[in-house]
């Protein structure tokens, strides 16, 4: 599985204006003045140590793009300052890339992008996969206070080279905050998969511990979060009880299903934990007394026997009682996996691919009607943070991914 620890990423991505950059970068005084202003306005995209000062080091001209890039030194560590209108490794200018990568949100195949925008399919594949190297948490969330207290988690079942694999997924606030690829769905593999989210979150806030996580009840998922965050409250998804009953009885016992479903959602709407528990008990008693078919009775009895897992949400305001948020995002993931015909390479390549997709999902603009409902904030990431660094969604993503999305010191200082 790919590691997302703070690698020797020493590239700071900054929102320089492409119209004035050439004039600015040639003059160290102008460059430093603009850099000082950026440090004051958005210190989170710079290394923590920069508050103690820095010095101008040197510069070089990119052979690929014929553009000058400057470097600075912060406490004996060298950092490259890359303008946000330039892609990582100087592969291209963002103005030539952003429309094509936006279409990847809708899973337009790489060969089609090459047909319309030029280059070749491998070029576009590598661009998307490279995004997967960035910390998802650190790129998506820019302030420790914005880290969510309440999570939703589940595994997407998919295939790699025809063999079954799983994508442990963590979401909150409408954003995908953690994805990994594992070969199994047992305790050990899922704990490793979900630990990526923990590592990235702790880099942003070392004492971070979420209050709740909503799961589908799978034991390995619950064990993974219990081991990673010992103080977390693990909730079970109420929606899964309804789905289990619906899938087994909607056609064969239609009238009874409608009656039970109505009663079930009335229980869900109970305003207190005590009322919720009472309504569930009465519903189960009715089902037993009237001898409901086992496809309906069994899930209801399971709900009653595990009532604590469903009712604890009343003690945590803002927690997720259902997995609706995750289900909506996983629908997009499901389409992505189907359209790409699942994974074809190594486990590491698969993980980079799905992480790159997650970044695009978090930062690419949404439907204009949705944007209007959020006061002009275009993407889930903007809505979570309440702001953006740049009007171009791709430049906003690149600035957010400064230092690879990590604030910790690089492993290799030179």
Sequence positions of predicted segments:
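RNase H-like nuclease fold core
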Residues: 126-212, 219, 223-224
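Short, flexible loop/turn motifs enriched in small residues
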Residues: 64-69, 160-166, 326
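Short, positively charged, Gly/Tyr-enriched micro-motifs
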Residues: 71, 75-162
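Mobile genetic element proteins and their domesticated derivatives, centered on retroelements
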Residues: 100, 113, 154, 174, ...
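Short, conserved DNA-binding cores of transcription-related domains
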Residues: 1-87, 340
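C-terminal domain-tail junction helix/linker
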Residues: 22, 297-301, 305-328, 332, ...
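Short, hydrophobic/amphipathic alpha-helical patches that form generic packing surfaces
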Residues: 102, 244, 266, 335, ...
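Extended amphipathic alpha-helical interaction segments
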Residues: 2-5, 199-214, 221-350
């Amino acid at each position: 599985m790919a590691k997302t620890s703070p690698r020797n990423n020493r590239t700071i991505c900054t929102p320089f204006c492409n119209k004035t950059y050439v004039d600015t970068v040639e003059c160290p005084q102008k460059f430093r003045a603009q850099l000082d202003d950026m440090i004051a306005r958005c210190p989170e995209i710079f290394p923590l140590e920069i508050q103690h000062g820095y010095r101008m080091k040197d510069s070089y001209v990119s052979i690929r793009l014929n553009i000058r890039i400057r470097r600075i030194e912060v406490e004996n560590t060298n950092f490259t300052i890359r303008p946000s209108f330039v892609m990582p490794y100087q592969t291209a200018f963002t103005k030539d890339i952003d429309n094509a990568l936006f279409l990847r949100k809708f899973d337009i195949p790489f060969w089609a992008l090459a047909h319309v925008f030029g280059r070749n399919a491998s070029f576009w594949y590598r661009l998307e996969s490279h995004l997967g190297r960035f910390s998802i948490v650190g790129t998506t969330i820019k302030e420790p206070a914005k880290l969510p207290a309440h999570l939703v988690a589940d595994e997407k079942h998919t295939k790699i080279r025809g063999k079954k694999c799983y994508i442990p997924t963590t979401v909150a606030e409408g954003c995908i905050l953690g994805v990994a690829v594992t070969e199994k769905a047992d305790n050990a593999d899922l704990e490793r998969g979900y630990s990526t989210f923990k590592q990235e979150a702790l880099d942003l806030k070392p004492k971070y511990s979420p209050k709740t996580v909503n799961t589908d009840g799978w034991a390995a998922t619950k064990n993974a979060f219990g081991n990673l965050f010992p103080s977390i409250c693990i909730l079970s998804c109420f929606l899964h009880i309804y789905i289990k009953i619906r899938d087994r009885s909607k056609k064969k016992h239609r009238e009874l299903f409608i009656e039970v479903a109505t009663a079930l959602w009335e229980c869900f709407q109970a305003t207190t934990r005590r009322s919720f528990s009472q309504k569930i008990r009465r519903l189960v008693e009715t089902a037993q007394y009237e001898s409901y078919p086992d496809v309906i009775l069994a899930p209801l009895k399971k709900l009653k026997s595990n009532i604590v897992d469903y009712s604890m949400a009343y003690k945590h305001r803002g927690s997720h009682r259902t997995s609706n948020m995750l289900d909506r995002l996983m629908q997009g993931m499901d389409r992505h996996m189907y359209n790409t015909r699942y994974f074809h390479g190594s486990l590491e390549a698969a993980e980079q691919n799905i992480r790159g997709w997650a970044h695009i999902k978090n930062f690419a603009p949404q439907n204009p009607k949705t944007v209007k409902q959020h006061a002009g904030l275009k993407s889930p990431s903007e809505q979570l943070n309440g702001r953006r660094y740049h009007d171009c969604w791709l430049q906003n993503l690149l600035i957010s991914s400064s230092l690879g999305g990590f604030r910790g010191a690089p492993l290799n200082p030179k």
